């Protein structure tokens, strides 16, 4: 039965008003005509999911089995990734980025450079604190600070014109590891495991091995899952601190333990039947099951007792500082995790806080000669041994090694005359292994190492290249969150094809 106007609400009567109807209809017709004209001229906004033909690829993740292996977007050699992260900002001009002009202008005021930087007034230009020498067959100039890594430069692919968006450590760590300066976004390792899963189910797909001194400045955000399913966050432990509650209580027999686990499985399965499609519940059940498998697999992988004495010597487990010994054991643990098929291993060399006698990372606003030397003694030999071990075993053919820090340091000293300030305008990272050129350098900073000058590379470009080496299109690997197709590279970045082997 038709509704009579007198029975309508005031709002309904307005909708039926003849004059209003004709006006609205006319505007709608005009809007349709305008849309057609704009579309003809290719000026109409497109569906963001299909701009440039880039339709998102959201992995089909089974919440009950989130770690099942998934196919890459295209074939590439990198099946696993080792990220060696050095918090605090390693000085590129004292390690891998040789600048002869610093020797020539040592002690002079820097030309055309701000009088004040991140932590105060600018001092004078300073030559490198360590001598640079040509290394390997390529003759790459590397300083004496890192002799172990210097011997391997023929296997490395350097990025010398990296830039970042911030000069603060927490935001810099976030940006390097998650693609955003703010917290709450998924880390690189989370994106990689969300896309690919893992070949082995008895260990986490993504493990973060923290420095013996603790977490880095941005804490667990460096390996967090953000808005991705919780299954893809990094599981953090190191050679001295295994995950909690791995050992069976002494008053619980193996039979009783297995019975408890089986009962829990049945109860969880029954509970899930009541709530089909509940991804959070299925994810929690999957995490419980992984924890059960880890009770056997983690103690086995952490048991370094079977490592030959020669290997322990190569890594520098003994004969150096206590911290070097602990970091060396972490490096061996990283190798063992990769051998067991863990997809992404993130190894930290540095923590928070820093300063004074409590130096815990590469931050060097004062006494850089001492602080960098201390960190190098911890990092260099074990890291070089780890990379050499991967090469010797053949694992480097399918493992991508990433050595990274959040930004560089200034070519001039701070006013105190003994340290270098933060430099977001230029810094160096390197890759090795699967899919990258060997003995190659990409990009250049200016003559002082102050700004990126040739082939400037953003962090988004760097991360896009890492994903590409794993067979993943950074523009199509997305997760729908808060109305947006989120990406590791936000809406930026391009693959640096010049570094691909």
Write out the residue ranges for each language-model feature.
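Ligand-binding pockets and gating/stacking loops
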Residues: 2-501
